[in-house]
């Protein structure tokens, strides 16, 4: 019998689970570029270079995007998939058509540019065009900037472009905030990321706004998107746009070089043409890489400020919880307080304050209607022995008649 018991125990102690993964086709859920060869699994840890880290970030981002697109595609029905493909093709056709149209515009401008250069009417019309494309969802802002440099030269074109951009973006900000006010409130109540980003702008709001304006984002859409942040004021947004106005010299310079190439094409030497073409390419590359660099810095700064804001809220919650006192308002501004309250609820769930601690016993006093009082309400209105004019002293009134009753409902609530 002991031998049978020992053999049975040894048999039960042997693991019957296979060390291999249950699903041999697990890698099929990942796109081809995210799969690594067996010999390269530890290549990132061996190299440890910055290029490996950047490569991993690009692969992870591409993988997440691939999964999101694939998940959205699987949720669509037949007609939704047809509409998505049609919208994708239409967007590509519009983009190609816009590029072709832009080229035709500069060909058409070549014979009239010299006449319009000293025309106040042409100056005013182009200024209004730049102003109105500031409102979403209009496009053509960069094209109008290049046209300004093409017709009026670098400095005069930049002055037109910058002044119309500053005033147009400010007016677009005000109009978008007025129209999108209800959308802002709904977004503040539901989206924690939106609330966190709006709170980060209260620290170095002007600096972050300038970085956002330098990012390669759609101009008119950016005006409408930033207007939804309640912590950003119109004057601050206009000031940030004015501070980054030297960036607008790039399209004006490109337009001026295009005119020089078109007018003096036959007279210019090969070296002069190469210099002008290279200056255009270098200007475009500087604008693209500067925008991408600032975009990454903006995201990093926003994450840093969000972490700081969450840390401050977490300390406040822990201090209030330890002192058994209700949470005060985070800010006098109702919009800022609403965003902070949303983050506070998220932090309470992370910390675990949503669940009551077993070591504490709270005394909850129900009202006459028998409704339960939440722990937050109990802390806000603690039990008191004093009587006010509206309360009755049961010891002073005596027993009273047989029909009169005084009841005190107390419950010791253990979470």
Swiss-Prot record:
This is Golgi apparatus membrane protein tvp38. Residues 1-81, 142-157, 256-273 are lumenal. Residues 1-10, 371-381 have a biased composition (Polar residues). The gene is tvp38. Belongs to the TVP38/TMEM64 family. One of its GO terms (cellular component) is Golgi membrane. It comes from Aspergillus niger (strain ATCC MYA-4892 / CBS 513.88 / FGSC A1513). It is a multi-pass membrane protein. Residues 103-120, 181-234, 295-415 are cytoplasmic. Residues 383-406 have a biased composition (Basic and acidic residues). Disulfide bonds: none annotated. Golgi membrane protein involved in vesicular trafficking and spindle migration. Residues 13-24 have a biased composition (Low complexity). The chain crosses the membrane at residues 82-102, 121-141, 158-180, 235-255, 274-294.
């Amino acid at each position: 019998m002991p031998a049978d018991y020992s053999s049975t125990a040894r048999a039960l102690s042997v693991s019957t689970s296979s060390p291999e993964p249950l699903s041999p086709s697990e890698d099929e859920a990942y796109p081809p570029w995210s799969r690594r060869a067996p010999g390269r699994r530890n290549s990132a840890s061996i190299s440890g270079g910055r290029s490996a880290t950047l490569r991993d970030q690009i692969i992870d981002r591409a993988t997440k995007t691939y999964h999101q697109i694939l998940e959205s595609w699987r949720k669509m029905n037949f007609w939704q998939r047809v509409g998505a493909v049609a919208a994708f093709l239409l967007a590509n056709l519009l983009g190609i058509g816009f590029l072709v149209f832009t080229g035709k515009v500069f060909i058409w401008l070549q014979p009239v540019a010299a006449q319009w250069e000293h025309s106040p009417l042409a100056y005013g019309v182009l200024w209004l065009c730049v102003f109105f494309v500031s409102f979403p969802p209009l496009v053509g802002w960069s094209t109008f900037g290049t046209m300004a440099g093409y017709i009026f030269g670098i400095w005069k074109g930049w002055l037109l472009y910058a002044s119309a951009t500053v005033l147009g973006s400010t007016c677009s900000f005000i109009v978008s905030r007025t129209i999108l006010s209800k959308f802002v409130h709904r977004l503040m109540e539901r989206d924690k990321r939106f609330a966190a980003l709006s709170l980060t702008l209260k620290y170095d709001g002007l600096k972050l706004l300038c970085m956002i304006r330098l990012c390669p984002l759609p101009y008119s859409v950016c005006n409408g998107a930033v207007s939804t942040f309640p912590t950003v004021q119109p004057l601050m947004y206009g000031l940030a746009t004015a501070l980054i106005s030297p960036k607008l010299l790039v399209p004006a310079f490109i337009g001026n070089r295009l005119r020089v190439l078109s007018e003096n094409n036959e007279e210019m030497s090969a070296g002069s043409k190469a210099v002008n073409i290279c200056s255009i390419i270098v200007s475009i590359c500087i604008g693209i890489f500067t925008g991408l660099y600032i975009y990454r810095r903006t995201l990093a700064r926003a994450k840093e400020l969000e972490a700081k804001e969450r840390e401050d809220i977490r300390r406040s919650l822990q201090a209030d919880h330890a002192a058994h006192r209700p949470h005060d308002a985070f800010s006098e501004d109702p919009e800022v307080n609403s965003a902070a309250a949303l983050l506070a609820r998220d932090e309470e769930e992370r910390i675990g304050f949503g669940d009551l601690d077993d070591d504490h016993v709270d005394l909850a006093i129900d009202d006459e209607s028998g409704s339960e009082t939440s722990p937050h309400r109990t802390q806000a209105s603690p039990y008191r022995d004093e009587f006010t004019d509206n309360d009755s002293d049961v010891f002073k009134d005596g027993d009273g008649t047989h029909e009169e009753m005084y009841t005190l409902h107390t419950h010791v609530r253990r979470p």
